[in-house]
């Protein structure tokens, strides 16, 4: 799909996608790193919005509000709401959380559209072990919303357990009984970059996939 290729091209151009040796939040060593925070210009955000919107339209899921967890999810949800309005004419609500509750003004830890009783689509960037997504779901539960689905920028396709061939997204789908989609996957990254990597980088990626990727 053209929007995937455009995102991957920009990811390499702006060092969103890098190869080397990186330590993930989990402590695992990885031969590649994807930092969506390096999408910092209007053209990049336009490409991101296009990709999220096309993925959501293809999901054909019914929802009222787009929720983006702080911090990276905030801008992702905002630009996606704009792009969906341009493409479909539907004006979806947009909301996000504060990591620190505000004690003055409107107060609280939720900003944006009213969500109580609404169908909410959760957006985020990269999923590895699913910790951030579970935290976002825990935040939403007491708000009395109906979670309609989850859309991610990148699925690293990693096993939850080295001994079990099940991905984080696979487990989430089973646990939540909800649609969970990602724009990009590790397979997409490998296919797009295979002719550009050095021999050492290719070897490291192959070894990493053999050890950690869910088949």
Swiss-Prot record:
Catalytic activity entry: orotidine 5'-phosphate + diphosphate = orotate + 5-phospho-alpha-D-ribose 1-diphosphate
InterPro entries: OPRT (IPR023031), Or_phspho_trans_dom (IPR004467), PRibTrfase_dom (IPR000836), PRTase-like (IPR029057)
PROSITE patterns: PUR_PYR_PR_TRANSFER
Listed pathway(s): Pyrimidine metabolism; UMP biosynthesis via de novo pathway; UMP from orotate: step 1/2
Domain of life: Eukaryota
Keyword Cytoplasm: no
Cross-referenced Pfam families: Pribosyltran (PF00156)
Keyword terms: Glycosyltransferase, Pyrimidine biosynthesis, Transferase
Listed EC numbers: 2.4.2.10
EC top class, as a word: transferase
Any single biological process term in GO: pyrimidine ribonucleoside biosynthetic process
Ligand binding (orotate): 33-34, 128, 156
Listed GO MF terms: orotate phosphoribosyltransferase activity
Gene Ontology CC terms, in alphabetical order: cytoplasm; cytosol; nucleus
Binding site for 5-phospho-alpha-D-ribose 1-diphosphate: 25, 71-72, 98-99, 102, 104, 124-132
Family matches, as NCBIfam families: pyrE
Stored HAMAP family: PyrE
Task of the protein: Catalyzes the transfer of a ribosyl phosphate group from 5-phosphoribose 1-diphosphate to orotate, leading to the formation of orotidine monophosphate (OMP).
Family indicated by similarity: Belongs to the purine/pyrimidine phosphoribosyltransferase family. PyrE subfamily.
Quaternary structure (record): Homodimer.
Protein's recorded name: Orotate phosphoribosyltransferase
Organism from which the protein derives: Schizosaccharomyces pombe (strain 972 / ATCC 24843)
Origin organism lineage: Eukaryota, Fungi, Dikarya, Ascomycota, Taphrinomycotina
Name of the coding gene: ura5
